Regions:
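Membrane-embedded alpha-helical segments of transport systems
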Residues: 59-66, 85-102, 119-124, 155, ...
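Hydrophobic alpha-helical transmembrane segments of multi-pass integral membrane proteins
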Residues: 42-69, 185-208
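Short helix-coil transition sites and intra-membrane helix breaks within transmembrane domains
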Residues: 24-28, 57-65, 166-167, 195-204, ...
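Helix-loop-helix hairpins and the membrane-proximal interhelical loops
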Residues: 1-46, 145-194, 212-215
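Cytosolic, long alpha-helical scaffolding segments
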Residues: 79, 105, 218, 244-250, ...
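Hydrophobic core segments of alpha-helical transmembrane domains in multi-pass membrane transport
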Residues: 8-22, 53-57, 125-137, 150-162, ...
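Interfacial loop-to-helix junctions that mark the boundaries of transmembrane helices
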Residues: 1-7, 109-121, 175-181, 221, ...
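Membrane-interfacial helix-loop connectors
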Residues: 69-91, 99-121, 159, 196-233, ...
């Protein structure tokens, strides 16, 4: 093979790997986080775990990616090790899908039907449709479909380029001699493992082997040990991802290794013993692309079947390899679900961000309600809890914000990118709500320390204000947690009512001050209190408006709120009226 032949082969390999990556990314984006959500909610049913593991891997075209994802789930405590075993088994079956697709390049025959099945017949059409969707469509889903079609077309073109480049090697004695060496089971396994470990994809390494079949020099006796080695080499990705993870995550990576390593040993021992007694006629024949796909599938299905009754043994083997220590019973870090491993699969990472953001929102809400209760019933321990929770919310903002910024730099769909931006805005508002909770607790502490108290009328007004603030807080956070846009639309009318409440309570305080029914010192406390209440309502409004804007694909906050209030929006006015009546202060003439 001359230099041009080598360049053609390497170029074909580059196109092949690029096409596989593009197709996998397109499939992953199109499926969104649905498949990952299914994995997160995995039951202990091993058959269901195997099927779902195979499905996810067939979709994202990478058993390594699935296994790394599983290692992340186990590391963050989302998935148990026993559940992970079934998914890992299924991933090994799902990864054979690529080899079956690539086997289409080996189709021979002159009939119309056989011609239509050849990639050279239909991939140009797929490429044209794909590039049309990518360049002309505004829909992100159609763009993803276009990416899948283009990726598949490039994958097949790269495969054919590699096959054509290596075809002349059929007459090369040195090449034939090298392949004959790999018919030695040990050398073949080592070669397959090294190749797969280097390119980090068993699907790609099997594809390269299928391309080599074009030379006619690859026999099944050579291909079998190489395929076995490829299944072992793919474990390197998961083992590397487990570095720095907890013990269960390391065990999950070892399960993947043991599954393939022991499965390979058992399969090869049985195969060569049977072949020695009853020689397989096909063993010394030239392999073709379909034959490679069959061998790849048979091994992975065989390994799954023999391990299925011994899943507990596989789990025990992992526990023996990575033993627990006495100090390993420390509580899990709640930020473990923000695992860097998930960043390789943005839809999974985004789901974890949402989960942490919900916890942060609940913590901020609980902190605010606790501080509001201190106004009527003060105790030092609750003040300490408010301060502790505020620090906890600060940590949430720091950890989650940093993770979201890392996630935002990844190749996200437009929808996921908008969700990341929404979360970044909302966690800032949650943090500010907890800050106002501390301010409110300081108002309560000042009143307690100085022996101050509100007048009866002021207490009645604050009680009504408390009700309105509790409702807007619950409405905004519940809407955020459930993605409920209709509920979010109830926040702004209530925020307008709260603004009016603050103004009216302040005016009433001034009247009482003039009549000598209230002191200036209490006036300062009251002003601080209702100002913090009103600011909390503003942050609730920010959260709701951000959700609505992303849903409506409109990002001018000032214009949105101005238009909402200025255009006599019927829904806004109706809700405003309902909330105004619900949180109406006692009649001024009677109270003053």
């Amino acid at each position: 093979m001359d230099i041009f032949g080598i360049l053609t082969m390497v170029g074909g390999l580059a196109l092949f790997l690029f096409g596989m990556n593009a197709m996998g990314q397109g499939l992953e984006k199109l499926s969104g986080s649905r498949l990952e959500r299914i994995l997160e909610k995995m039951t202990s049913n091993p058959f269901k775990a195997i099927m779902l593991g195979a499905l996810v891997t067939a979709v994202i075209q990478s058993s390594s990616a699935t296994t790394v994802m599983v290692v992340g789930f186990v590391n963050s405590g989302i998935m148990k090790l026993s559940q992970a075993i079934g998914v890992i088994m299924g991933a090994n079956i799902g990864t054979t899908m690529t080899s079956w697709l690539l086997s289409l390049t080996g189709i021979q025959g002159d009939s119309l039907f056989m011609q239509l099945l050849k990639p050279s017949s239909f991939t140009p059409i797929l490429a044209i449709i794909g590039i049309f969707f990518i360049m002309m469509s505004k829909s992100s889903k159609k763009k993803d479909i276009g990416t899948i079609l283009m990726g598949f077309a490039i994958l097949m073109f790269g495969m054919e380029t590699m096959s054509n480049a290596v075809a002349p090697l059929a007459d090369n004695e040195q090449f034939t001699h090298i392949l004959t060496m790999f018919s030695n089971p040990v050398l073949g396994v080592i070669a397959g493992a090294i190749l797969t470990a280097v390119i980090q994809s068993s699907s790609a390494s099997v594809g390269i082997l299928q391309a080599m079949c074009a030379t006619g020099a690859v026999t099944y006796s050579t291909a079998l040990p190489i395929i076995m080695g490829q299944n072992i080499g793919t474990c390197v990705t998961a083992l590397l991802s487990a570095i720095g993870a907890n013990k269960n995550a390391k065990r999950a990576a070892l399960v993947h290794l043991y599954f393939n390593l022991i499965g390979t040993i058992v399969f090869m021992v049985l195969f060569y013993i049977i072949n020695a007694i009853f020689p397989f006629e096909f063993f010394d024949q030239s392999a073709n692309q379909a034959g490679i796909a069959i061998l790849h599938s048979v091994f992975n299905i065989f390994a799954t079947i023999i391990w299925l009754p011994f899943m507990k043994l596989l789990e025990k083997l992992a526990y023996i390899s990575v033993r627990d220590k006495k100090d390993d019973n420390a509580p899990a870090n709640e930020f473990q679900i923000l695992d860097p491993r998930f960043l390789a699969t943005p839809s999974v990472a985004l789901e974890q961000c949402k989960s942490v953001a919900v916890r942060m929102a609940d913590c901020a809400r609980d902190t605010l309600k606790l501080s509001m209760g201190l106004i009527s019933k003060y105790n030092d321990r609750d003040v300490e809890i408010v301060n502790e929770n505020e620090e906890k919310v600060d940590v949430y903002e720091d950890k989650l914000g940093s993770y979201l910024l890392q996630l935002g730099s990844k190749n996200l769909t437009p929808g996921d990118s908008q969700t990341v931006n929404m979360l970044l805005h909302c966690i800032s508002d949650f943090e500010r709500i907890s800050d106002h909770a501390v301010n409110i607790s300081e108002c309560a502490k000042e009143m307690h320390t100085k022996g101050l108290s509100f007048s009866k009328k002021a207490i009645e007004e604050i009680h009504i204000f408390n009700g309105a603030l509790n409702e807007i807080l619950d409405t905004a956070i519940t809407a955020f947690e459930h993605g409920d846009i209709e509920q979010a639309k109830s926040v702004e009318p209530l925020e307008e009512v709260i603004d009016n409440l603050r103004t009216e309570i302040r005016n009433r305080h001034v009247k009482r001050l003039r009549k000598g029914k209230c002191t200036i010192e209490m006036g300062f406390v009251l002003t601080d209190l209702i100002t913090n209440y009103e600011r909390v309502a503003d942050h609730c409004s920010n959260i709701a408006v951000c959700m609505i804007q992303i849903h409506d694909n409109s990002f001018d906050t000032h214009s949105y709120i101005s238009d909402l209030k200025a255009t006599n929006n019927e829904e806004f006015r109706r809700k405003f009226t309902v909330f105004s009546e619900k949180y109406m202060l006692p009649d001024a003439k009677k109270t003053d």
